[in-house]
């Protein structure tokens, strides 16, 4: 099969036989966009090559994105000196694509109009090599100039009316088709020239995926050959043609990734292709890239700082310990695109700290080689200097988390909650609850639910993981039977991986309920009564922290399930909705019912908590302290309290725990700031003393304990395998480092 023509056989193999079969024959099914996760590399890609040895070495990355008029104006010596000053051991440098920053010999590869006889890319590469740095070349293929459009009009993206697409920001440029010959042939030649001439360690491509839908002749022909369909005329993901197109798009990008990687390795065996973002994480799991970078440069709008750490967890869920870098911007990252701006020091520091605490290696990105605002330079220097001095404690070998939150790309792709709010709100609410409860946790990907992976954890959490396959349900069921804990909410397992509604929950036996097929809501002014066990006269452990509460607020959407056991515990029961206006009518029509709103059970050797309502989503919306207590109690009970570390003290602190070759670390990120939910931070505000109690890895003993940020040796108490460390204060990020013997 040629690199440029993905035929029907390859399409079916890549996206999965069952799903593709529903997409290629013109039959309408319940499958929606991107529902299929790859489980093995397609045969036409071949076995994945080993990771080049250099990939795991760099710990601090520097990226200089040149602009076209930089040649002859920017000071390359300054940047090389700055890379050295910040202890950067790898660089990503602009090379080609839209603009060539070297004397390219490829026709239509636009040389910078300011290039002259210079070679700024080559100068930077040589300077970095002299400093012992790894170097990857940045290319950007998403736009081209008039000469390209005239010579090869078929390389340009076409809109639904058959018109070539101008660039949305710079109308002098044209948007290229990412899935046709421009990438598969022209950019392949560009990459080959760069690697051949400069012997770089890899190619990193920005905006390599389609920037918009394309109706060019290549997309029409290749999509028809792969799927038997015409291009979709709608963006509605429920449309079968649209679903087929999205599956084909993913397959085509995977083919392009494999092509570029193989071609680069043929030129230089120790080099590789690194996409700036895979088609999805399931594809990254199959393609096994030797290194990946999370391009989540800063927060915008209503975004908490833990968002950077979340992106780290997402990549770690599929990277199997291979390195993950975190790209961060030194500017203001908002939709208005102030690319020459400078962000506050406090904001940059906390953003990078949260990524570091979650196992990302920092990568600063600077646009334009000519500096117009130098305020960020000492900020990055301070961050990188700290990182360099403590590198051996940041080269992690394993997460020590005992809780995992399920990452379900299937649910995101195929499921729309009844609230019509983003399905991600459920995950965000659960994520925030775990962070606020100071629970160290990982993300585990739905395509990787093997016993080996699941059994690392005492608990797996399903935050409305609505779309799960039978095999995924079986894996979770077996995990619980082996002794694992499970916390699940709302519609978890109600649909299969294609988004088709099941007659009953896929995990009904674990939840202890039967699906009635209904959903109630949106509810207003509904409540939950906290009940004692009539046999013991005490409340269930999941209600810990709510001792003085007779009732708490309910959610907005609930499933009226039928219990499988009449004598199951009933810690929470329904108080049905009643009027909230006029005020004279605001009284409950039923003070209490026996309708259970949480199901707790101990099937096999495991423990299960199931909330048949949207507790996680509502928590994200209103941040009720009572809902936080419910979620924290469920996690604590279902996990049997197993945790590598317990941290007590004032403030909102994110906690992570890691193992290194001869040490372990506990990261404490201080999120206690009035700008925590809406940046940028104005200043860092210290919080008071924290008590850290941790369990040493089996067969080890602590030889030294250090607080890396304060540079002090804390008061420490040993009790067998347990260690208690007193941390006097945290400004933004403290790391408890324990040397082991």
Where are these regions (language model features)?
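N-terminal secretory signal peptides and thylakoid transit peptides that target proteins
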Residues: 2-19
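Carbohydrate-binding surfaces of carbohydrate-active enzymes
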Residues: 47-49, 135, 238, 242-243, ...
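Glycine-rich, aromatic-flanked loop segments that form ligand/cofactor-binding clefts
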Residues: 61, 90-93, 123-166, 272
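Aromatic- and glycine-enriched glycan-recognition loops and surfaces
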Residues: 68-86, 109-131, 255, 425, ...
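Active-site-adjacent "subsite" loops/lids of carbohydrate-active enzymes
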Residues: 141-198, 233-246
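Active-site neighborhood of glycoside hydrolase catalytic domains
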Residues: 182-277, 282-283
């Amino acid at each position: 099969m040629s690199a440029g023509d993905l035929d029907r056989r390859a399409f079916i193999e890549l996206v999965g036989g069952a799903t593709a079969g529903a997409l290629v024959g013109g039959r309408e099914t319940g499958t929606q966009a991107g529902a299929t996760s790859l489980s093995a590399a397609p045969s036409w890609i071949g076995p994945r090559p080993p990771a080049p040895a250099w990939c795991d070495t760099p710990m601090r990355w520097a990226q200089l994105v040149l602009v076209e008029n930089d040649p002859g104006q920017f000071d390359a010596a300054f940047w090389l000196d700055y890379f050295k000053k910040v202890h950067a051991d790898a660089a990503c440098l602009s090379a080609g694509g839209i603009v060539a920053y070297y004397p390219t010999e490829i026709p239509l590869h636009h040389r910078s109009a300011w290039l002259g006889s210079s070679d700024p890319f080559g100068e930077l590469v040589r300077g970095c090599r002299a400093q012992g740095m790894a170097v990857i070349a940045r290319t950007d293929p998403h736009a081209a100039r008039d000469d390209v459009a005239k010579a090869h009009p078929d390389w340009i993206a076409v809109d639904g009316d058959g018109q070539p697409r101008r660039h949305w920001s710079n109308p002098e440029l044209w948007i290229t088709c990412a899935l046709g010959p421009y990438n598969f042939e022209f950019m392949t030649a560009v990459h080959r020239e760069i690697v051949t001439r400069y012997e770089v360690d890899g190619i990193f491509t920005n905006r390599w995926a389609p920037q918009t839908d394309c109706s060019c002749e290549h997309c029409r022909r290749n999509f028809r050959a792969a799927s038997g369909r015409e291009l979709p005329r709608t963006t509605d993901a429920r449309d079968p043609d649209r679903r087929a197109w999205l599956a084909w798009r993913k397959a085509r990008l995977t083919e392009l990734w494999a092509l570029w990687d193989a071609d680069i390795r043929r030129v230089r065996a120790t080099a590789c292709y690194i996409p700036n973002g895979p088609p999805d994480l399931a594809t990254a799991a199959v393609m096994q890239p030797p290194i990946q970078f999370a391009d989540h440069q800063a927060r915008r709008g209503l975004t908490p700082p833990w968002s950077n750490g979340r992106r780290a967890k997402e990549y770690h869920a599929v990277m199997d310990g291979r390195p993950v870098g975190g790209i961060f911007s030194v500017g203001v990252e908002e939709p208005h695109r102030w690319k020459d701006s400078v962000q506050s020091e406090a904001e940059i520091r906390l953003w990078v700290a949260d990524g570091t605490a979650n196992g990302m290696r920092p990568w600063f990105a600077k646009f334009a080689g000519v500096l117009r605002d130098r305020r960020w330079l000492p900020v990055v220097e301070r961050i990188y200097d700290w990182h360099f001095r403590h590198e051996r404690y940041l080269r992690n070998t394993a997460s020590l988390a005992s809780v995992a939150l399920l990452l379900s790309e299937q649910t995101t792709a195929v499921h729309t909650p009844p609230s019509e709010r983003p399905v991600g709100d459920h995950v965000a609410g659960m994520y925030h609850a775990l962070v606020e409860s100071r629970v160290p946790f990982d993300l585990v990907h739905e395509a990787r639910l093997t016993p080996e992976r699941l059994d690392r954890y005492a608990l797996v959490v399903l935050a409305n993981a609505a779309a799960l396959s039978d095999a995924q349900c079986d894996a979770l069921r077996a995990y619980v039977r082996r002794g694992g804990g499970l916390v699940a909410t709302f519609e978890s397992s109600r649909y299969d991986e294609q988004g088709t509604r099941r007659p009953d929950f896929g995990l009904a036996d674990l939840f202890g309920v039967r699906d009635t097929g209904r959903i109630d809501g949106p509810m207003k002014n509904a409540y939950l009564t906290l009940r004692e066990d009539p046999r013991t006269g005490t409340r269930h452990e999941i209600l810990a922290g709510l001792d003085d509460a007779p009732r708490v607020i309910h959610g907005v959407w609930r499933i009226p399930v039928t219990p499988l056991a009449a004598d199951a515990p009933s810690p929470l029961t329904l108080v049905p909705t009643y009027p909230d206006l006029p005020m004279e009518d605001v009284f409950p029509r039923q003070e209490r019912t026996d309708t259970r709103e949480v199901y707790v059970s101990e099937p096999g050797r495991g423990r299960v908590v199931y909330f048949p309502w949207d507790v996680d989503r509502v928590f994200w919306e209103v941040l009720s302290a009572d809902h936080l207590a419910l979620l924290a109690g469920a996690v604590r009970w279902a996990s049997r309290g197993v945790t590598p570390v317990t941290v007590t003290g004032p403030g909102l602190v994110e906690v992570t725990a890691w193992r290194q070759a001869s040490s372990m670390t506990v990261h404490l990120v201080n999120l206690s700031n009035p700008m925590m939910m809406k940046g940028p931070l104005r200043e860092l505000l210290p919080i008071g003393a924290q008590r850290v109690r941790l369990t040493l890895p089996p067969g080890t003993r602590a030889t030294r304990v250090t607080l890396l940020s304060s540079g002090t040796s804390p008061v420490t108490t040993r009790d067998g395998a347990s260690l208690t460390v007193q941390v006097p204060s945290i400004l933004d990020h403290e790391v408890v480092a324990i040397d082991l013997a």
